């Protein structure tokens, strides 16, 4: 998902999506360790999405503190 689309979402939605992605990352790492992972590139995509969401949440937090 693009950063622009993520910025339009509410923080509660972003937190839910963040939790889902963390769960998915855990599952992917488990599959990697057991040799069942079909697409190792998915780990990179999920980690990037997690970083984007965390960055947007932090930006909103700092914006709220300034006001």
From Swiss-Prot:
<comment type="similarity">
    <text>Belongs to the universal ribosomal protein uL29 family.</text>
</comment>
<dbReference type="InterPro" id="IPR018254">
    <property type="entry name" value="Ribosomal_uL29_CS"/>
</dbReference>
<dbReference type="GO" id="GO:0006412">
    <property type="term" value="P:translation"/>
</dbReference>
<dbReference type="GO" id="GO:0003735">
    <property type="term" value="F:structural constituent of ribosome"/>
</dbReference>
<dbReference type="InterPro" id="IPR036049">
    <property type="entry name" value="Ribosomal_uL29_sf"/>
</dbReference>
<keyword id="KW-0689">Ribosomal protein</keyword>
<keyword id="KW-0687">Ribonucleoprotein</keyword>
<dbReference type="InterPro" id="IPR050063">
    <property type="entry name" value="Ribosomal_protein_uL29"/>
</dbReference>
<dbReference type="GO" id="GO:0022625">
    <property type="term" value="C:cytosolic large ribosomal subunit"/>
</dbReference>
<dbReference type="InterPro" id="IPR001854">
    <property type="entry name" value="Ribosomal_uL29"/>
</dbReference>
<protein>
    <recommendedName>
        <fullName>Large ribosomal subunit protein uL29</fullName>
    </recommendedName>
</protein>
<dbReference type="Pfam" id="PF00831">
    <property type="entry name" value="Ribosomal_L29"/>
</dbReference>
């Amino acid at each position: 998902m693009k950063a622009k689309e993520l910025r339009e979402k509410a923080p509660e939605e972003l937190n839910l999506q963040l939790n889902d992605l963390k769960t998915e990352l855990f599952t992917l790492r488990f599959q990697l360790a057991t040799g069942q992972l079909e697409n190792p590139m998915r780990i990179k995509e999920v980690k990037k999405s997690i970083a984007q969401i965390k960055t947007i949440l932090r930006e909103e937090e700092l914006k709220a503190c300034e006001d």
